[in-house]
Amino acid sequence: MKDKEKVITALVSFCNNIEKWFTGEGEQDMLYQEIVSGFSPDFKMITGDGDAVSFYMFSEWLPTVYGKFPSRLVILEDIEVQYSGKHGLATYTEIQTTEEETTCRASSAIFLLTEEKALWFHLIESWI
């Protein structure tokens, strides 16, 4: 798989899986492992509210929201990918809809490129 495809696959797979996670679809333990295996243990995130989140914090948060949003949809738009060497950069818009509430965020994500796949390394979100 080419580097650009690895980044897009990681991004789309995560968004599909987090939607399943929020809605409670699928077997929880298997889905949890599938989600966290896509991240570097050094992953860091800056949320739309400006909070810093580590991989540990993210992995501890996940079980608290399994099945909490049965109607949530997660949609990606405007995906652009750049890459060089061992890193990929994706910029995109993420739209989450739960019943009548919709949130949008502009995001930039850095991925570590391995032989097999791209791993989430750093994510910055901004509310739009």
Describe each PLM feature range.
Residues 2-10, 23, 28-29, 44-128:
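A beta-strand edge to alpha-helix "cap/lid" segment located at domain peripheries
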